[in-house]
Amino acid sequence: METNCRKLVSACVQLGVQPAAVECLFSKDSEIKKVEFTDSPESRKEAASSKFFPRQHPGANEKDKSQQGKNEDVGAEDPSKKKRQRRQRTHFTSQQLQELEATFQRNRYPDMSTREEIAVWTNLTEARVRVWFKNRRAKWRKRERNQQAELCKNGFGPQFNGLMQPYDDMYPGYSYNNWAAKGLTSASLSTKSFPFFNSMNVNPLSSQSMFSPPNSISSMSMSSSMVPSAVTGVPGSSLNSLNNLNNLSSPSLNSAVPTPACPYAPPTPPYVYRDTCNSSLASLRLKAKQHSSFGYASVQNPASNLSACQYAVDRPV
């Protein structure tokens, strides 16, 4: 090899041997080359330099030079890459903004063809229009979130505050703290103020009289209900006077209380089964009942003449 030959020459020079010529044969690319080294100052310098700095292949030097040139180019380009390129801001005119806003109100997500038409109308590029719609949608979503947060913070919002009035304003005379301890007495209720009843000029305590039946009806029903129980111990004259009293009070009751249209049919006499074989026994029993209840049928006649609705009102449940 060439390096081995150079080492031998340098060793001979150091030992003081001065060879006339040294032949070194080495193979490279299937070729045999002959290298001659003569004893000259140039050869000695070259041998000494090759001892401390080994000789490199000429192809390697070219590769190193090309790599160094690339490194220098990269080092020169690094500062430019580190600097961030400044984007150019688009300044929209009032007409362009009006056109874009009108389109945004109609359609917040325009497609490619719509954006191209808007770009033609506004004299802008499609990319500028796309970026504007993207920013406008982000601003719209932010505003919607802020409005929802304000509604949640303020309850139902100012538009519902007028509909919901506090109870203290509606009933100023009613105390909510002591009502359970004092109880709902008639005196406490009479002193409280109720706007609903005051507007109608109605006393809350007198509402019971609006729905309660008249005293005459109740007394009439009581007297009529007590009659059958006391029939047996009362003579006939007293029963006749009581019957006359009922007859006198019934027309006055009908004239005082207006009776609505009765949905029930008038009462019909009950069906009585008559057996021809036992007619004699039935007639005897009927006569016996008539003698025992001497005035009872005349007392029940006024009640039987009433309709179904009047009978339901007169008779207690």
From Swiss-Prot:
Q: Which GO terms describe its biological process?
A: anatomical structure morphogenesis; atrial cardiac muscle tissue morphogenesis; atrioventricular valve development; branching involved in blood vessel morphogenesis; camera-type eye development; cardiac neural crest cell migration involved in outflow tract morphogenesis; cell proliferation involved in outflow tract morphogenesis; deltoid tuberosity development
Q: Which residue intervals are annotated with compositional bias (Basic residues) in the record? A: 81-90
Signal peptide start-end: none
Q: Where is this region: Disordered?
A: 35-99
* Locus of motif Nuclear localization signal: 285-289
Which intervals of the chain form a coiled coil? none
Q: Where is the composition biased (Basic and acidic residues)?
A: 35-48, 60-73
Membrane is among the record's keywords: no
Q: Which UniProt keywords apply?
A: Cytoplasm, Developmental protein, Disease variant, DNA-binding, Homeobox, Nucleus, Peters anomaly, Phosphoprotein
Looking up InterPro entries in the UniProt record yields: HD, Homeobox_CS, Homeobox_Pitx/unc30, Homeodomain-like_sf, OAR_dom
Q: Which residues carry this modification: Phosphothreonine?
A: 90
Q: Which GO terms describe its cellular component?
A: chromatin; cytoplasm; nucleoplasm; nucleus; transcription regulator complex
* Modification(s) after translation: Phosphorylated at Thr-90 by AKT2, but not AKT1. Phosphorylation impairs its association with a CCND1 mRNA-stabilizing complex, thus shortening the half-life of CCND1.
State the compartments where it is located.
Answer: Nucleus; Cytoplasm
Domain of life the protein comes from = Eukaryota
List the GO molecular function terms. Answer: chromatin DNA binding; DNA-binding transcription factor activity; DNA-binding transcription factor activity, RNA polymerase II-specific; DNA-binding transcription factor binding; DNA-binding transcription repressor activity, RNA polymerase II-specific; identical protein binding; phosphoprotein binding; protein homodimerization activity
Q: Where is this motif: OAR?
A: 279-292
DNA-binding region(s) in UniProt: 85-144
Asked if the keyword Protein biosynthesis belongs to this entry, the reply reads no
Q: Name one Pfam family in it.
A: OAR
Q: Which disease is it linked to?
A: Axenfeld-Rieger syndrome 1: An autosomal dominant disorder of morphogenesis that results in abnormal development of the anterior segment of the eye, and results in blindness from glaucoma in approximately 50% of affected individuals. Additional features include aniridia, maxillary hypoplasia, hypodontia, anal stenosis, redundant periumbilical skin.
Say what the protein does: May play a role in myoblast differentiation. When unphosphorylated, associates with an ELAVL1-containing complex, which stabilizes cyclin mRNA and ensuring cell proliferation. Phosphorylation by AKT2 impairs this association, leading to CCND1 mRNA destabilization and progression towards differentiation.
Outline the subunit composition. Interacts with EFEMP2. Interacts (when unphosphorylated on Thr-90) with ELAVL1/HUR.
The UniProt entry's sequence similarity note says: Belongs to the paired homeobox family. Bicoid subfamily.
Q: What is this protein called?
A: Pituitary homeobox 2
* Native organism taxonomy: Eukaryota, Metazoa, Chordata, Craniata, Vertebrata
